[in-house]
Regions:
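N-terminal non-catalytic structural scaffold regions of very large proteins
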Residues: 1-171
Length: 171
């Protein structure tokens, strides 16, 4: 399947014969879906299972994901979170010839998905995306990690620490 925004990075999802779920950003080299999810903030396997449920394809994808192994490598005392390591993996796939750093990887990822000038799924696309993935029911009773700010107005829509109910999720 594909997510093709009005502006911004295309996301293409595919599975292989081993039931591993892959994603391509802007038709670049493929990476494990779980690496993308870890970069989005779902760092642990349990976080991902809570988001998507238990599925043999998801388990196969988590087993293939190199993020955990890479994050645990010794770097002379520098400890990386799973999110940071996932960001670096995505950065290496998108820009293989450039030197990597957590800061540059974070900036690239934010510009790919969080900059309203560069990424826009539009209202209809957002509706279809949320409906197909049942986002409202999946995030029900979760806690908001960071303030959610309306990119057009700068208004804080939801505060960090707030518990999401179905009414909030549908907004």
């Amino acid at each position: 399947s594909q997510i093709i925004p009005n502006r911004g990075a295309w996301l293409e999802y595919e599975t292989d014969s081993n039931d591993i779920i892959w994603v391509r950003l802007d038709r670049a080299r493929k990476l494990c879906l779980t690496a993308l999810l870890r970069a989005l903030g779902y760092e642990t396997d349990d976080d991902i299972r809570n988001l998507l449920g238990n599925d043999k394809r998801l388990e196969a994808t988590m087993a293939k994901d190199a993020t955990v192994a890479e994050a645990s490598k010794d770097r002379g005392g520098a400890v990386r979170t799973l999110r940071e390591q996932a960001l670096l993996i995505i950065y290496k796939k998108q820009k293989p010839d450039e030197p990597e750093s957590v800061e540059s990887a974070t900036n690239m990822f934010k510009s790919l998905f969080y900059d309203p000038k560069r990424y826009d799924v539009m209202r209809v696309g957002r509706y279809k995306f949320n409906k197909k993935l049942s986002i409202a029911t999946r995030i029900n009773k979760h806690i908001i990690a960071e303030d959610i700010i309306d990119p057009r107005t700068g208004e804080v829509m939801f505060r960090a620490g707030q518990v999401i109910d179905l009414e909030t999720a549908r907004r």
